[in-house]
Amino acid sequence: MEHFDASLSTYFRAWLGPRDTRVEGWFLLDNYVPTLVCSILYLLIVWLGPKYMKTRQPFSCRGILVVYNLGLTLLSLYMFCELVTGVWEGQYNFFCQGTRSGGEADMKIIRVLWWYYFSKLIEFMDTFFFILRKNNHQITVLHVYHHASMLNIWWFVMNWVPCGHSYFGATLNSFIHVLMYSYYGLSSIPSMRPYLWWKKYITQGQLLQFVLTIIQTSCGVIWPCTFPLGWLYFQIGYMISLITLFTNFYIQTYNKKGVSRRREHQKDHQNGSVAAVNGHISSFSSLENNVKPRKQRKD
């Protein structure tokens, strides 16, 4: 394993140049193997987990979901506030910011972005909860691609460009995650579900953050500074891939759902009656995805 890690380090050094010495010795950053192993295990669980749960009752996970989503909401809020204040203190340039031009504020940004990297490991739990609750329809290509890639990308970011122009996407994403995980946390509480009408606007916000990130990253290409251009080109390409996948998700989830509901409504009127609707919601996920409710385990 040490030989493998040394070979990887040599390859990365030849490909990307020397690492940023400010993160030497930081947890999970010294070598790539732990991040790679976590990613492989994640993909194995995504593959094998639904097979294991196929003949088993889904878990409720309600209590732990409330705590989990509250924790990620607070962590995202902390990261957003720290990044905003760090950028202000370092007088960061919106158009392009090098990795060694912000003074003491750079170290503040680096510390917060390490938490951002680590949060991507924590967010693997999103998928594991889907598996335990047998919400396999939510384990999409977009979901797995986004979760698996972000952890790996941010390992490289933290080792080579841990501050400077790297701050912008993480700041926007932290803000979106405050909204997203607060929504998920509230949706775990049955009495709150009738008031959660703003789910699709979170997806719109995610698409907006990708567009804004491309615009801000492009500024660094048009008006370059000491921040490496290769990282900026990669960021733009990655954002385009996410926009493509998220746009497809939005169309599949909301536009087609609206067309389907209108057709059902027209069909009911043509038959001379309107379908009756239950006076209560038995399962939030069933309502959202038109899935028959399943009996859940209490553990």
From Swiss-Prot:
Transmembrane segments: 26-46, 64-84, 112-132, 139-158, 168-187, 205-225, 226-246
Chief location of this protein within or outside the cell: endoplasmic reticulum
List of residues that carry Phosphoserine: 285
Topology within the bilayer: Multi-pass membrane protein
The protein's Enzyme Commission number: 2.3.1.199
Modified positions (N-acetylmethionine) in chain numbering: 1
Keyword Acetylation (UniProt): yes
GO molecular function terms noted in the UniProt entry: fatty acid elongase activity
InterPro entries: ELO_fam (IPR002076), ELOVL5 (IPR033677)
GO process annotations (BP): fatty acid elongation, monounsaturated fatty acid; fatty acid elongation, polyunsaturated fatty acid; fatty acid elongation, saturated fatty acid; long-chain fatty acid biosynthetic process; long-chain fatty-acyl-CoA biosynthetic process; sphingolipid biosynthetic process; unsaturated fatty acid biosynthetic process; very long-chain fatty acid biosynthetic process
Domain of life: Eukaryota
Function: Catalyzes the first and rate-limiting reaction of the four reactions that constitute the long-chain fatty acids elongation cycle. This endoplasmic reticulum-bound enzymatic process allows the addition of 2 carbons to the chain of long- and very long-chain fatty acids (VLCFAs) per cycle. Condensing enzyme that acts specifically toward polyunsaturated acyl-CoA with the higher activity toward C18:3(n-6) acyl-CoA.
Family membership noted in the UniProt record: Belongs to the ELO family. ELOVL5 subfamily.
Name this protein carries in UniProt: Very long chain fatty acid elongase 5
Gene: ELOVL5
